[in-house]
């Protein structure tokens, strides 16, 4: 499973805590993240994470392109709906693409936990079957 990680600045520490809590499950998957999020997650967990550009410098667009090409299976996007800054990822573009390509997406820690537990139980195996990987 290819999981993309994005976090607004005010949610990056929460992303690190989430990844630390679920390091065992995440370690069994391929992780992709935007610039600063990679460093924070890797420093907290030691997990290998494929590095993209920072969100405000094209990283969100890289993830969007990967979604469009079928290269992302899940998006964990910890957003700050109140304090998002200019230059942070375009939320609606990413969410629209996830809807168009049937990509499970979490925009907060509660939904991310539901997806991670579903991944652990095998509830999301249909994704790789649909993409012809198993």
How would you label these PLM feature ranges?
Residues 13-22:
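Histidine-anchored nucleotide/phosphate-binding helix
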Residues 28-37:
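Short internal beta-strands
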Residues 30, 47-58, 126-129:
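Short hydrophobic/aromatic-enriched beta-strand-loop microsegments
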Residues 60-100:
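Mid-chain, well-packed structural core segment of small domains
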Residues 95-115:
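Short, acidic/small-residue loops that bind anionic groups at enzyme active sites
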Residues 110-134:
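Short, glycine-/small-residue-rich phosphate/pyrophosphate-handling segment
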């Amino acid at each position: 499973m290819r999981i993309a990680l994005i976090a607004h600045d005010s949610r990056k520490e929460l992303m690190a805590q989430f990844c630390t809590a679920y390091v065992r499950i995440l370690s069994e998957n391929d992780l992709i993240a935007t610039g600063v999020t990679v460093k924070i997650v890797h420093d907290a967990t030691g997990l290998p994470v494929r590095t993209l550009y920072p969100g405000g410098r094209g990283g969100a667009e890289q993830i969007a392109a990967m979604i469009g090409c079928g290269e992302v299976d899940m998006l964990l996007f910890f957003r700050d709906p109140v304090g998002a800054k200019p230059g942070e990822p375009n939320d609606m573009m990413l969410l629209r693409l996830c809807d168009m390509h049937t990509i499970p997406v979490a925009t907060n820690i509660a939904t991310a936990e539901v997806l991670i537990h579903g991944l652990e139980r095998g509830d999301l195996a249909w994704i790789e079957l649909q993409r012809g990987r198993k």
